[in-house]
Amino acid sequence: MSSLNVTERFRIRSLSIERLRRQALTLAVSSPLLRWRYAGNGTDQILIVPQELRAADPSFWSEIAHGHFGLASEIADLKGASPFRAEPPSLAWARKLHGFGWLRHLAATEDEDAAAAARAFVLEWIALRRLAHGVAYEPEVVGRRLISWIAQANMLLEDLDARSYTAIMQSIGQQIVTLKTTWRNAPDGIPRITCLIALVLADLAVSGHDRQLKEAQVALVEELKRQILNDGGHVSRSASVLADLVLDLLPLGQCFHSRGRKAPEEISVAVKKSLSFLRFMRLGNGMLARFNGVSTGSPATLATVLGYSGGNFEVMAAAPTSGYARLERGQTIVIADVGSPPPLEIATEAQAGALSFEMTSRRSLIFANGGFPGPADHDWDAVARATASHNTLCLAETSSSHLVRHMQLEAMVGGLPIRGPDAVVSEQVDEAGQAVLHATHDGYLKRFGLLHSRRLKLSPAGDRLEGVDVLEPPKGKLRLKQDLPYAIHFHLHPDCRCTESGRGTCRIKVSDGQVWIFSAESAALSIEESLFFVDSAGPRPGLQVVIRGTTFGETEVRWTMHAEQLDVTA
């Protein structure tokens, strides 16, 4: 951690002023003088029900029946108590509980007992939540709850007596008003978009609220244009947030058509760009590459999302605005991080993985970054975010990015953001059918006076990856006062096996039978322990190949990964 520079101090001051402005505006529109304008006309009714596109797990109902409530990778043992009275295992669990996204699992059972339980849960929540405060009334949680209740309205409102029906509809109406007055206080990024999607959906789906539709629609369009970059990536540089965004935006677009209204073009544009970027970031095993907050995920869910893009598509070769590069030859895919961290206010899950890469061959993941831990494993966050947990060079046991420790900033953004490298430049070329990437970052320049450059070259058949890592000053010659240790990490997926097969060489056996040989020229190579943080059961031990050495100011390390046993036509 290091002191803040003038630019960062100015940025924090600007964020503080913007936060105060949003809070003042929220306070103003929440006053009795203005709050009335957000109320509906008469008794609220559900006019349309959006399609639920997220996958559902009917077994969730049987778990509840046995007293277990599993959310956000944690399970609460209810012991006969209400989940709303139970002690939350974590803040993430509480947010999921009050967001009610889990209602879709009960709906998927098509069981009347499960449907009755869903209605009872909602009515109990209404009875217990008389005061609008706490986790349940964080803007993003309110937004997710509105989306969930409206999407499951057919189940929730079926066979209700007049009193219960009125209670649910009045609660929906009150929550719409609450969100319309508080959404500006949502954290920047996807939470703010979620709030606005919920408001637009509510204005379309609930009677009497459509007079504010234009206002919410304009705000949503502005956020989509600001947050979705030209190449389809999200401003946070996390690919995983886009899958959920698409699953919210697609039904929203359908709701416009159901109401006989034209959906804003920006919604379909955001969906198309997001789908294109998700295809770009998907490896051969069907999963997203693990950079900047990408955690556990389901290949089936991603495949479902990408299915909405149709069959005619061409995967981009690069995503320069988002800061990623993709090399693909034969059945081998390499995706590399060639970007700087996102803005401070949305960098709390960004990782120090400059010039790191992941690699799949056929459907097997070989080189994998540590990834971002799930909600139940946040104790590992700092380790997972460090450069040493990525497939790249780490100089003097120091990460290429730094955590920014500032109490006011942490309070505003909800965590520790990172900063640096300031400059990352890259170029992709084709050399006689070989996919080649050149990239350089300055994450070590201020502390050590050195740049880290990396060259990756993937053969036309995809059976050979050559790499060159270089440490050098930006110009001229440099002799350090003392030699600095470096380590180039190559983390293997836990399913891979690795054994030394000679000096500077090791043999990697992949789970599907492939065998690859990794070798390094004139450098010490070792096989060491590693951790894969994104396994659904928690951090999983594995192995990594590490090239270690020291630099006096200028160093070049060459390494090669080639297939010993690989049928590239399989």
Language model features with spans:
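Carbohydrate-active enzyme catalytic cores, enriched for enzymes
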Residues: 198, 229-372
